[in-house]
Regions:
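Shared catalytic-loop signature of beta/alpha-barrel
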Residues: 56, 62, 73-174
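Metal-dependent enolase-superfamily TIM-barrel catalytic cores that perform enediolate-based chemistry
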Residues: 1-80, 84-85
């Protein structure tokens, strides 16, 4: 979901939680219940209670996950948010090592980890993150929108990971 158009990921901003909930509802109405709907909010909320308040407003829209709801260093907040909402929490695109990913899975209690093959140390390190996530019952949705090579690497990574239902990428044009 892109809050501000025309469908440019770089313009994503949430000015009002009610507007966010309305956008989620309108997207759900547009695509129907059969379509998987995810929302990347680009670290929109500064604390878990604010994120929870907004997510509670759109709970019935059945988001598959909410991506990057809080600053990546707020693992305690991610943990509390993950425990308090039905929507899966997802993060990891900015993490630099497998160890940061492991810590985010454990301390952040995330439902979906999103390693970026180009940032986390390549395919081998990303695969280690995937294996760890699978062992912990965490889904993997690799983050990638830099290049065709990165998308190909993420696609190959996802093919080796049972817990990987999707990859994230940003096409040149929407």
């Amino acid at each position: 979901i892109c809050i501000k158009g025309p469908y440019s990921h770089n313009n994503l901003q949430i000015d009002d939680d009610r507007e966010f909930a309305k956008m989620v509802r309108l997207c759900r109405e547009a695509v129907g219940d059969e379509m998987t709907l995810m929302a990347d909010v680009a670290y929109a909320w500064q604390d878990w209670k604010s994120a929870k308040r907004a997510l509670d407003m759109c709970e019935k829209e059945n988001l598959f996950f909410i991506e990057t709801p809080l600053p990546i260093e707020d693992l305690e907040g991610l943990n509390k948010l993950s425990q308090s909402v039905q929507t899966r929490t997802a993060t990891g695109e900015m993490l630099q090592t497998r160890y940061e990913c492991f810590e985010t899975i454990i301390r952040g209690n995330v439902d979906v980890i999103q390693p970026d093959v180009g940032r986390v140390g390549g395919l081998t390190e990303a695969k280690r993150v995937c294996d760890f996530a699978e062992d912990k019952g965490v889904l993997v949705v690799p983050h990638c929108w830099k290049s065709a090579i990165g998308i190909a690497a993420s696609t190959h990574l996802s093919a080796t990971t049972l817990a990987c239902p999707y990859i994230e990428f940003l096409p040149n044009e929407l």
